[in-house]
A protein has these predicted regions:
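Phosphate-ester processing/binding pockets and catalytic centers
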Residues: 1-179
Length: 179
């Protein structure tokens, strides 16, 4: 087990060495039955991630395009959410009684390109990152407590924005724990 953890940490550190070319964010839902989760945890996490990617691609200088390459877990759900977000996304008003704004995601280039993670080192790395984020939010006794920290500068702290300060940089805990 120790050797595997060492290899795992080395893979995460290698991503950290590639920063700022490689940047990582993660959305973790520690409680699937939280009252703030509107549909199901997987859909809500994808929705939060797509919202964040839309803002990131729009505000970045120069503006950048986004291509989603998820694993084969939920292809229909992810495709449906991405298509809806690309054309019809809305942002609610920040003020009571205000009107919502249309905020489409035109920088999402194509439908998600689903791949089997067994066939892609890129997606295996994404699985490592997702597991590191999950285990940082929900630790396990037999694993090191802060695997996410191994990513170093690759963990995109800007993802947290105005979110609670107790979240690790680049990890969005959804729904947040302020409720």
């Amino acid at each position: 087990m120790r050797k595997r953890i060492g290899v795992y940490k080395s893979a995460l550190r290698l991503l950290g060495d590639m920063a700022p070319v490689v940047q990582t964010i993660a959305v973790v839902a520690p409680d699937r039955h939280h009252p703030k989760i509107q549909e199901n945890a997987i859909q809500d996490c994808w929705q939060v991630l797509l919202e964040w990617l839309e803002r990131f691609s729009f505000k970045r200088e120069p503006q950048t395009e986004v291509i989603l390459v998820p694993d084969e877990g939920n292809p229909l759900t992810v495709r449906k959410l991405a298509r809806r977000r690309r054309r019809f996304a809305y942002a609610p008003s920040a003020f009571p009684g205000g009107s919502s704004q249309k905020v489409p995601f035109p920088r999402l280039v194509e439908d998600p390109l689903h791949r089997n993670s067994r066939d892609s080192y890129f997606l295996q790395w994404a699985d490592f990152v997702a597991n590191a984020a999950f285990r940082t939010v929900i630790p396990r006794a037999d694993l090191p407590p802060n695997l996410w920290g191994e990513l170093g500068d690759a963990a995109l702290a800007a993802a947290n924005g105005q979110r609670p300060r107790n979240e690790p940089p680049g990890v969005i805990v959804w729904p947040d724990r302020r409720m």
